[in-house]
Amino acid sequence: MLSVEIDREEDGRWIAEVPDLPGVMTYGQTREEAVARVQALALRVLADRLEHGEAIPEVASQFLVTP
């Protein structure tokens, strides 16, 4: 399971990141938008790593969203 950390910025935007995948961070106008974007980006990063024979964190097919 990959953890998604999410927080609200001072300007009202939401930021979501996956700590186990450095650089996987997105913004959204809503919490849901930020989470959906970061999940999609994380899956693309994992697929790219697999395609290039790189190691990936041991994960299931789920994300755990934490405030």
Question: Can you say where each PLM-predicted feature lies in the sequence?
Answer:
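Short, charged, surface-exposed hinge/linker loops at domain edges
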Residues: M1-S3, E32, A36-P67
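Short aromatic-glycine-(Arg/Gly/Cys) micro-motifs in beta-strand/loop hairpins
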Residues: D7-L21
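Hydrophobic residues in alpha-helical membrane-spanning segments
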Residues: D20-G23, E58
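A short, exposed loop/beta-hairpin motif centered on an aromatic-Gly-Thr core
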Residues: P22-E33
